[in-house]
Amino acid sequence: MIPRDLDGYTDLHSHLVPGVDDGSRTLEESRAGLIKLLRSGVKRIVTTPHFDASLTRDAALMEERLAQIDRAWEELRLMSSSEFPDLELHRGQEVMLDIPDPDLSDRRLFLADTHYILVEWPGLRVPPSTLPVLARFVEAGMRPIIA
């Protein structure tokens, strides 16, 4: 018997939430992406739409962005649970560190309700402040994963 955590792959970085970023534009594109991943042996997916860390400085803008993602994610979840009942679908964000000191206290920014957080930087350039920023995250109990 294969232990559950070794049974199939887990995708921790996907843009399958329809219409919220540069990934799937429609639910049909998301469905096609799910099929490809399932055929590749993926059993668990954490969806990670783009989220700008600077939004954490404005509660209204942050809630507006998360509500947009929530609506589209629920549509994806309903389709997935109906058509692919054996697939585990989880939520997260790919947090763009466009500011050096974001407030990452909101659990919705983390991967699948864990202490892991997927991060990236603007322009695919790692700024000089990266090591101190990541050290602060780790000291706060977070486990950053670099996209």
Locations of the language-model features?
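Extended substrate/RNA-proximal surfaces in nucleic-acid metabolism proteins
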Residues: 57-147
